[in-house]
C-alpha cells in the first residue's frame, strides 16, 4: 500500500518574494501559511529596481518619463527576485520549490484532497519543470492529466503552455540550470529586458513554449493575487479572475497526443517566431529611443496595431 504524502511535506521549501518596506504584505501572507512548517518558509528580500546599477542612465532610459522609468525598474526588480529564488533553491539542493509573490491569495489550504491531487500529479509526471497553481492562460489549449471533484466544483491539473503571471508556482530542480542560464543578472538586466520584456513574458513566449519541457497548471486557479498597491504598475491592482469557486479561464482541453503535436505544427511555429521577431524589433526600438510603456500590446492589438502604436509614440518623441 502506497504512503500518502501531503502537499506541504512534498514541497522542500517555500520562497516568498517581499520588498523590505512591504511588511504589510509579508504579515498578510504569513497568516495564510500558519499550517505550513515554519522552517520551510523563506523570505527572499526582493530587488528594489530603482536601486539597480545604471537606473535612469544610458540609452534605455533616454527620454523616459518618471512613470516609465519606475515601471521598467519594477519589472527588472521582479525578474531578478524570481531568479534569486531559483538560485536559492538550487543552493539548498531542493528538488521542488514553491515560489510566491507576497500578494498571493490562496483559495485552498492544499492540506486536503486538492493538495493530495497536486502531489500525485508531480509524482506521476516523469519529467516536468514548472507547475503553476495560479496564472493567466496565454494559450487556449491544455491537456488534462488529473481531475478531482470538490465542494467548489471540479479542479483540473493540466499540461499547459507557459502562462502569464508568476505569483504562485512550483519549480522542479530539472529547470534550475536552464532558468539561471537564461535569466539576467544585475549586470545585463536592462539589455535583457528590452527584448524579453518581463519574467512572465519570457516564460510565456520562450521557456514555456518548448516541446521538451512540461509546464503544468490548474483550472481554476488555486491561488490568485490580492488587491494591493503594485510596485510595478504604481496603482492598486488585483488579478482574481478564474479563481477556485468562480468560473475558470476559458480553455479547450485536448488529449496528450494532440497537445504534443501543437509544438511542431507550422501555424504554431510561425506564430512563435513572429512573436520572437516582434520582441527583437521592440528591443531595437528601446535601444534607439529608450524604454516606453505602451497602452497596447501585441496580445491586445495584434502585430499591426502594436506597430502603429510604437510608431505613434516615436513621432511624439
Enumerate the language-model features and the residues they cover:
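An acidic/histidine-cluster motif and surrounding catalytic segment
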Residues: 1-100, 104-317
Amino acid at each position: 500500500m502506497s504512503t500518502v504524502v501531503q502537499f506541504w511535506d512534498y514541497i522542500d521549501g517555500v520562497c516568498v518574494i517581499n520588498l523590505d518596506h512591504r511588511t504589510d504584505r509579508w504579515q498578510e501572507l504569513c497568516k495564510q501559511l500558519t499550517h505550513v512548517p515554519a522552517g520551510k518558509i523563506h523570505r527572499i528580500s526582493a530587488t528594489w529596481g530603482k536601486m539597480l546599477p545604471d537606473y535612469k542612465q544610458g540609452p534605455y532610459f533616454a527620454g523616459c518619463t518618471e512613470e516609465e522609468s519606475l515601471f521598467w525598474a519594477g519589472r527588472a526588480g521582479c525578474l531578478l527576485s524570481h531568479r534569486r529564488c531559483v538560485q536559492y533553491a538550487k543552493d539548498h539542493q531542493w528538488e521542488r520549490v514553491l515560489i510566491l509573490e507576497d500578494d498571493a491569495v490562496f483559495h485552498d489550504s492544499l492540506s486536503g484532497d486538492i493538495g493530495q491531487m497536486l502531489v500525485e500529479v508531480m509524482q506521476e509526471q516523469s519529467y516536468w519543470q514548472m507547475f503553476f497553481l495560479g496564472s493567466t492562460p496565454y494559450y487556449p489549449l491544455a491537456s488534462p492529466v488529473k481531475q478531482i471533484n470538490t465542494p467548489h466544483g471540479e479542479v483540473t491539473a493540466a499540461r499547459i503552455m507557459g502562462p502569464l503571471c508568476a505569483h504562485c508556482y512550483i519549480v522542479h530542480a530539472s529547470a534550475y540550470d536552464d532558468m539561471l542560464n537564461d535569466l539576467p543578472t544585475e549586470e545585463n538586466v536592462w539589455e535583457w529586458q528590452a527584448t524579453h520584456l518581463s519574467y512572465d513574458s519570457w516564460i510565456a513566449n520562450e521557456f514555456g513554449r518548448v516541446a521538451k519541457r512540461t509546464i503544468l497548471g490548474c483550472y481554476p486557479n488555486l491561488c490568485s493575487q490580492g488587491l494591493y498597491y503594485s510596485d510595478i504598475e504604481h496603482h492598486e491592482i488585483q488579478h482574481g479572475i478564474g479563481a477556485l469557486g468562480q468560473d475558470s479561464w476559458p480553455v479547450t482541453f485536448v488529449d496528450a497526443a494532440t497537445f504534443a503535436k501543437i509544438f511542431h505544427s507550422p501555424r504554431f511555429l510561425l506564430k512563435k517566431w513572429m512573436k520572437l521577431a516582434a520582441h527583437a524589433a521592440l528591443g531595437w526600438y528601446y535601444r534607439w529611443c529608450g524604454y516606453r510603456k505602451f497602452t497596447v500590446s501585441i496580445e491586445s492589438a495584434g502585430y499591426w496595431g502594436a506597430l502603429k502604436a510604437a510608431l505613434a509614440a516615436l513621432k511624439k518623441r
